[in-house]
Amino acid sequence: MKYDVNELKHQLYSGILCDVMDGMGYRNQAISNKINPLNDETVIFGPAFTSIGTEVYSMPEDPLTAQCKVVDQLGEGEIYVLVTRGNYNCAVFGELFATAVKARKGAGVLLDGYARDLKALKEMDFPVFFRGKNPKTSKGRCEINECQIPVTMDGVAIRPGDYIF
């Protein structure tokens, strides 16, 4: 049986999904309340496109090339999942990459790090879940160059293609 993702997005809610997953024996499938949406009404639903950020200590010649190459691989309807491995010294997501994800028709972003340009993200009505805010750019601080590999966010294992809600 096929389901319309957009229809399910409006019919389901996180509590019932957690109850069902618990009943199936998957008891650690919810991200904690440390990661929140920009707007409380925001719902994202779609397959995960995973990536990992690594802390760096020097400014590369072309600092955004690696992340641009990763985002360019994002497919329509996918959720851009970015794990920072506890690197909270900068924002790893903002208006520039929101524009890129939106252009690729990504369904939203889930990151365990910081975001910036929040006013612009709100004006774009861009669905993003994040840990907090930080005005500092990721250039020379964090590089995203690994993608479509299994990741762990907030203790929850996420594989490429896993559905995020």
Language-model segments: what does each one mean?
Residues M1-P160:
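Feature captures the catalytic cores and cofactor-binding loops of soluble hydro-lyases/lyases
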